[in-house]
Amino acid sequence: MYNESPIIRRKSSRIYVGDVPIGDGAPIAVQSMTNTRTTDVAATVAQIKALENVGADIVRVSVPTMDAAEAFKLIKQQTNVPLVADIHFDYRIALKVAEYGVDCLRINPGNIGNEERIRSVVECARDKNIPIRIGVNGGSLEKELMDKYKEPTPEALLESAMRHVDILDRLNFDQFKVSVKASDVFLAVESYRLLAKQIVQPLHLGITEAGGARAGSVKSAVGLGMLLADGIGDTLRISLAADPVEEIKVGFDILKSLRIRSRGINFIACPSCSRQEFDVISTVNELEQRLEDVVTPMDVSIIGCVVNGPGEALISDIGLTGGNRMSGYYKDGVRQKERFDNNNIVDQLEAKIRAKVAMSESRIPAQDVTK
C-alpha cells in the first residue's frame, strides 16, 4: 500500500513541551486552545480533557489576569496534557504561572513589553526549564513595524520574530519555538517560508482567526498544506470559531491527508451517485461517529458501486464495494468470500474494523477473527 509520505521535513532543533518532543524529526504535534473563562476552573478542565480524548498533544490556555494565573494552578493540578500559558501585555503573569508548573510560555512580541521584561521571562524560564513560544501575529505587530511597513507583510512578521529571536540568542536561551501567524493564507505562508530560512528552531504553524468550522478548516488546510508539503512545521493549531475539539480533528485530518501522521480511521468514500447500491453518505457519517475512539491508523474504503470500489479496496486495510443487495468485502486488499447485507452494513463493518484494530493492538490472539 502507498503509505509513505514523500515529504522531506526541514531540519530543526529539539525542545520539549512537557513530555512532548517538538522538532528534530519528532511527530508534528497537534494542539488547540481552550475558549472557556480560565477562571472557571471546572469548565476549563472539562474542555482540556475533551481535547485530550480526541488526541490533543498540547493545549494552550489564555491567562489574561493574575486571577486567571491562580486558576491556572488548579487547572494544571487536574489535567495531564502539557499546557501552554498564553501571555499578553503583563509579563508578570508569565512569572507567576511559571511557579505553577506551566509546560510552555507563549509571549507576543507585539505587546509583551521591552527587552528588560523579556529578559525577566527568559531567566525565569531558564531557571525552571520551561520553553517559550515567540508568537508573532499579523494583527498585533509592534507599532514601529506598522509605521515602517504600513501594513502586515511577510517582511514585517519576519522582522518582529527575528527581533525577539535575537534577544533570546543574546541571552543564550535556545529552548524556544516560533510562529508568524496571519489570517491571510499567502501572508502566513510567505512569512513562514522566510522564517524557515533564518532559524533552526521549531516552527509552530497556524492560520490565525481562520473563520468558522467549514471555511476555517478549508483555509487552514490550504495554508498549512502548502507549508507542510514543503517540509515546514513542527507543531500546529487549527484556529476555528468552533468547538476546539474540531480543531484537533481537522489538524489530524490535514496530517493524515499528507501521510505525515495518522490517527484513527482514514475513510475513503465516494460522494455517491445513482449507481450506489447502499446509502454511502449515512454509512460513512454513522461510522465516523461510532469509531471516534479508535486511535490505530487504518484505511477504510466505502464505495457504493463496482466502478471504483475494487480498485480502492485493493489499497485499503478494509474495503467495501457496493453490490446488488449484498456488497463485497475486502481485507488487506484481498476480496473475501463473505459479503455484507446492504441493510446492515454499518454494524457489520464496525465489527470488522474493531476486530482488526484489536489485532493490530495485540489485545487479542493474532488470528483471523474477521474472515
Swiss-Prot record:
[4Fe-4S] cluster binds at residues 270, 273, 305, 312. This is 4-hydroxy-3-methylbut-2-en-1-yl diphosphate synthase (flavodoxin). Keywords: 4Fe-4S, Iron, Iron-sulfur, Isoprene biosynthesis, Metal-binding, Oxidoreductase. Belongs to the IspG family. NCBIfam families: ispG_gcpE, PRK00366.1. HAMAP family: IspG (MF_00159). PANTHER family: 4-HYDROXY-3-METHYLBUT-2-EN-1-YL DIPHOSPHATE SYNTHASE, 4-HYDROXY-3-METHYLBUT-2-EN-1-YL DIPHOSPHATE SYNTHASE (FERREDOXIN), CHLOROPLASTIC. The keyword Mitochondrion does not apply. Converts 2C-methyl-D-erythritol 2,4-cyclodiphosphate (ME-2,4cPP) into 1-hydroxy-2-methyl-2-(E)-butenyl 4-diphosphate. Transmembrane segments: none annotated. It comes from the Bacteria. It catalyses: (2E)-4-hydroxy-3-methylbut-2-enyl diphosphate + oxidized [flavodoxin] + H2O + 2 H(+) = 2-C-methyl-D-erythritol 2,4-cyclic diphosphate + reduced [flavodoxin]. One of its GO terms (biological process) is isopentenyl diphosphate biosynthetic process, methylerythritol 4-phosphate pathway. It is an enzyme of class 1 (oxidoreductase). Binds 1 [4Fe-4S] cluster. Pathway: Isoprenoid biosynthesis; isopentenyl diphosphate biosynthesis via DXP pathway; isopentenyl diphosphate from 1-deoxy-D-xylulose 5-phosphate: step 5/6. It comes from Shewanella piezotolerans (strain WP3 / JCM 13877). InterPro entries: Dihydropteroate_synth-like_sf (IPR011005), IspG_bac (IPR016425), IspG_bac-typ (IPR004588), NO2/SO3_Rdtase_4Fe4S_sf (IPR045854). One of its GO terms (molecular function) is 4-hydroxy-3-methylbut-2-enyl-diphosphate synthase activity (flavodoxin). Its EC number is 1.17.7.3.
